[in-house]
Each structure stands twice: as structure tokens, then as C-alpha cells.
């Protein structure tokens, strides 16, 4: 399951900072402050008012075969916004591998969790398997998730690691099985730029990876 590294760790950290600065506007705009924090107001009517309940979004049902075990370790946060990022980031990755296994680069489930630009990148990744008649099987742990939220909490950077040491590809036509080449680091670091859409779904805008970047 070896994949080409796309960038370096230093570049990833720079990209994360740039993402969050852009989302915050790079300044201290009053619109980003907590409402009422310096107004001195404690009006019951103000505190009682609540924004309308967010509409329930029907998310796609994503199924993976038992032959491919994609597990997520410590995928929880006490912060509800961070947890929402983790939840949708998890489903985005599951949808990608489901698309590979189903030989479907145009996966609607993956498109649901991607922006238009993000889905274009996802399709290239999926086709790097499907164009070669490859599917995946085995075990792929996903671990060490970290979420960095923009000040306005409408953009985020999600990073995590995967361990491909027990993940394999199989050629659909010949049955040939391949794992990581000898001497290849099985751990891959990922950095996903995410944005919340109008329906409240956290979508991937872009993704970068570095093999061996988890140590």
C-alpha cells in the first residue's frame, strides 16, 4: 500500500498556520470576539435567545468489507467542534477506501465529504488504485489525531497517522498481492485542510502526506 509522499513536515506546519490565519482573516476583527464579552449585559432575554436548530443532515452510509479493517484510535475530543471535525474526517477517509474497494472514483459518498477542489484531488488518489485494477485489504490503523481550529471555527486542520505494515493491494485481474516494499516506512503522516459547509458538514479542501512523518 505504499503511496507517494506529497510534502514535508515543515511545509505541512506552514500550511496549517496559513490555513488558520486565512480563516481568521489574519487580524483581530471585533466580529471574531465573543458576543457580549465586554458589553456588561446580563439581560435574561439575551441569554435565553437561541439560534435555530441546525437542520439534520442525511449523511451517506459507508460500508467496508471485513477483509479491510480500518480502525481509528483515540478518535475523541472533549470539544464538540473538534469532535465534529474528527467525525467527518473519519468518514471522509472511510469513503475514500470504500471507493477504492468498490472501484468507484466518482464515489458520491467521498464527494459528500469533500469540497469540489478536494474531490478532484480525491479522485486522483482513488484512480491511482483503480486505474491499475488494484483493491485493498488487510489492516490499517489510523491514530494520533490532532485538530487545529480557526478562530471563527469554520475551518480546521486535521492531522493523523496511519500504519500500512499490515495493509496490502490486490490486482483484481491477476490476483497479485503487494505490501510495502522492503525498507519503506509503513507510517504515513496526513494533514487535511477542512472547512464547514452551509449544512454543517466538515469537508476536506486539500490533503498532504509524508511517509515516515509520524516519528
Place the predicted regions along the sequence by residue.
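C-terminal motif of bacterial Sec signal peptides marking the signal peptidase cleavage site
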Residues: 20-23
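Bacterial signal peptide processing site
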Residues: 25-28
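Core segments of small alpha/beta cavity-forming domains
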Residues: 62-135
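Bacterial N-terminal signal peptides that target proteins for export
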Residues: 1-13
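Cys/His-rich zinc-coordinating "finger/knuckle" motifs
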Residues: 31
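Post-signal peptide N-terminal segment of mature Sec-exported envelope proteins
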Residues: 34-60
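Structured, amphipathic secondary-structure segments that form assembly/contact surfaces
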Residues: 105-215
